[in-house]
Structures are given as structure tokens and as C-alpha cells.
Amino acid sequence: MSSQFSPREIPSIILAWAVLSIGLSYSFILGLVNGNTSDLQYLIAAAIATATGFILHEMGHKFVAIRRGYVAHFQIWIWGIALTLITAVASGGSFLFGAPGAVYIAPAAAIGAYGYGYYSSNQQAADPQQENMLISAAGPGINLVFAIFFLVIYELSTTYNFVAILATFGLELNVGLGSFNMLPIPPLDGYKVFKKNIQFALMIALPLWGMFLYFFLH
């Protein structure tokens, strides 16, 4: 597993995770600073939700790409990190533009530039659009799975305890990130999936969009 990551990649993933977790729970961090220790559970829930909604979304892209014979590495985006923190601070935690980094993909021939291993595939680029569709769909697909998982937990919760808080954060992040990324607009994931297979794209997009409309606009 370690051979699948470049030396800088793990620190980059941890930094992106921390920044997005801080942005997602910024208002509760302010509560902690002001002595409200009960807000710690919100920070922990945000960190777990970020791991499922953002980190696993990006790792979905990465490992499907590797499995298809490509080189894939996560790279932080400095301006994205700044924008994530600025929007969180400026809005007091009520609005967040979360874009701390992304997975970058290259042909396997580029492996020397990154210096780490990958699963080889003799079928690489047999159908570039098909490959691109599968890689692009992996992230929102993971968001959909976790959105359904957290929805079940949310509906089964009878009291507003830590589990319910985690389910709320998990729903917000997975539904928000997944539904946005499935919009058929370049360069989003949805554009690449819809371009190749509309029916397959709708199988992922419609449940995410439906949950977004219900939970965010209801």
C-alpha cells in the first residue's frame, strides 16, 4: 500500500483533511475557544465526515485510476486551502468552499516523474473515455454509498447524540460534495461520466441530487 503513495502525498492528504475539517466545524472551534467543551464532539464528527466525504472520494479516484494502469497522486492546492479557510472564517462557519486539493492522473509512462509504484494494466487506454468515466465516477459513487449509510443512521437516531451529529455532518458533506461533482459541467466528474454514459451517470446523480434537494432546500 505504501508503494502507491509518493513521499509528499500522505502529508498532503493529512493537511487537506485537517483544513477541510476545520472549515466544516469552524463555528464549533470558536465555541471551544470560548470554553464550550461540548463543541469538541462536533469537531470530531466533522473530521470523521471529512474522511468519508472528501478523502475517500479522492482515494476512489486514485485507486480506480491505479487499477486501470495510470499513475495517480493527491496534490494540495494552496489557493484552494486559502479559499477554504477564508470562506469559513468570513462566514463564521455558515458557508464553506472546500477545495484543498485533488487527485492528478497521468499515463503510466509518467511513473518516473513521481517515483512510486502502481498496479499495472495491459488494458490501459483501450477506450480513454470509458477509463475516464470509471475513474471520474469513483469519487461521487463513494459519496453516494456513504450518503445512504449516514441517511440510515440519521433516520434511526432517536436522540441528538454524537452518532446523530456524525450522521448530520456525513450527510451534509457526502451529499453536498457528491451532488456538486455530478453536475454535467466541465471539469467536474459528472461531465466526464455523462459524456460517456448518461444512464450510468443518472444512477449516481439522481439519488444525490434528490437528497440534496430534500435536505438542503426542504
Report residues per predicted region.
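Hydrophobic transmembrane alpha-helices and their immediate loop junctions
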Residues: 1-218
